Amino acid sequence: MIQQETFLTVADNSGAKRLQCIRVLGSNRRYAHVGDVIVASVKDAMPNMGVKKSDVVKAVVVRTRATMRRETGNSIRFDDNAAVLINDDQNPRGTRVFGPVARELRERNFTKIVSLAPEVI
């Protein structure tokens, strides 16, 4: 579960390395899960890239350390909390996605992120 002040790693090549969640988008929501959109601040970034430190960006959560129950009864959990930066059209800002992503992203219509990911779990 991602909430305000949570730090996340960035799973794409947009230039940001670490994010801090500012707000979970939705109607008065406290926690974000895989597939939810958050507003975050860039805390660490690579120089001469598209984003820089202290930029406020939108991102979609692709991995969480919290255990997730699926409708089939399986549970899944990842080693880190990670997000992919998106623009206002819900498309990723980077051209590559690193690490596995959850299958729930396809159900939330983030098919571009799923197609860029090396592994879908």
UniProtKB/Swiss-Prot annotation:
CDD domains tied to this protein: Ribosomal_uL14
GO MF: large ribosomal subunit rRNA binding; structural constituent of ribosome
One GO term (biological process): translation
Domain of life: Bacteria
SMART domains, A to Z: Ribosomal_L14 (SM01374)
Signal peptide: none
Keyword Ribosomal protein set for record: yes
Pfam family, any one: Ribosomal_L14
Keywords annotated in UniProt: Ribonucleoprotein, Ribosomal protein, RNA-binding, rRNA-binding
Keyword RNA-binding: yes
GO cellular component, one term: cytosolic large ribosomal subunit
HAMAP family named in the record: Ribosomal_uL14 (MF_01367)
Job of this protein: Binds to 23S rRNA. Forms part of two intersubunit bridges in the 70S ribosome.
PANTHER family in the record: 50S/60S RIBOSOMAL PROTEIN L14/L23, LARGE RIBOSOMAL SUBUNIT PROTEIN UL14M
Similarity section: Belongs to the universal ribosomal protein uL14 family.
Entries under NCBIfam families matching the protein: rplN_bact
Assembly, per entry: Part of the 50S ribosomal subunit. Forms a cluster with proteins L3 and L19. In the 70S ribosome, L14 and L19 interact and together make contacts with the 16S rRNA in bridges B5 and B8.
Protein name: Large ribosomal subunit protein uL14
Organism whose genome encodes this protein: Prochlorococcus marinus (strain NATL2A)
Gene label: rplN
